[in-house]
């Protein structure tokens, strides 16, 4: 897995505060400042660690919201989203709709990785605020579905018998 991070620095912003915002979420990121002609500049970087992001999502109890955002931004082998700079500056995760001012994050799966598995690791589903094992949940749901189908067949068979009984009584 590789995480690509980009954040534009507007003329009204302190470039080192923007850098701090990124490092508060991705402390192991290697960042480079790139001067731009029409803008003040942009921080670009990469990391392989999402541990701090995972920790913040759990401590802020926003795993389900994070999961929704990660799934919404998912492509074949990646997911992308924006983080609010001001929130990141104070060490908090807040997903940003503003694509022009936020911190752009793209998480790329390696060839032998599944992006959905990475998303499940970063933001597992919860029930009542408690992380649930999705694999067990999926097995349970499949079992329940199978039982419902069996019950449905029984009802269909009973219905057929009733129809036959009613027609023979004439």
Swiss-Prot record:
Bias category Acidic residues: which stretches?
133-148
Q: Write out the biased-composition intervals (Basic and acidic residues).
A: 149-163
> Which residue ranges are recorded for the region named Disordered?
133-170
Cross-referenced InterPro entries: PAB1135-like, Ribosomal_uL5_dom_sf
Q: Which Gene3D superfamilies match?
A: 3.30.1440.10
This protein's name: UPF0201 protein MJ1564
**Originating organism:** Methanocaldococcus jannaschii (strain ATCC 43067 / DSM 2661 / JAL-1 / JCM 10045 / NBRC 100440) (Methanococcus jannaschii)
Q: Which family does it belong to?
A: Belongs to the UPF0201 family.
């Amino acid at each position: 897995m590789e995480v690509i991070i980009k954040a534009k620095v507007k003329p009204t912003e302190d470039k080192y505060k923007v850098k701090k915002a990124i490092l508060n979420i991705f402390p192991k990121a290697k960042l480079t400042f790139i001067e731009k002609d029409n803008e003040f500049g942009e921080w670009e970087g990469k990391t392989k660690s999402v541990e701090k992001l995972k920790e913040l999502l759990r401590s802020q109890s926003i795993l389900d919201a994070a999961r929704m955002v990660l799934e919404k931004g998912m492509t074949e082998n990646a997911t992308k989203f924006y983080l609010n700079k001001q929130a990141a500056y104070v060490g908090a995760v807040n997903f940003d709709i503003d694509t022009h001012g936020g911190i752009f994050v793209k998480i790329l799966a390696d060839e032998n990785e599944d992006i959905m598995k990475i998303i499940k690791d970063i933001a597992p589903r919860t029930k009542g605020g408690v992380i649930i094992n999705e694999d067990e949940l999926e097995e349970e749901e499949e079992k329940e579905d199978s039982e419902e189908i069996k019950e449905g067949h029984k009802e269909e068979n009973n219905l057929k018998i009733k129809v036959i009984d009613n027609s023979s009584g004439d």
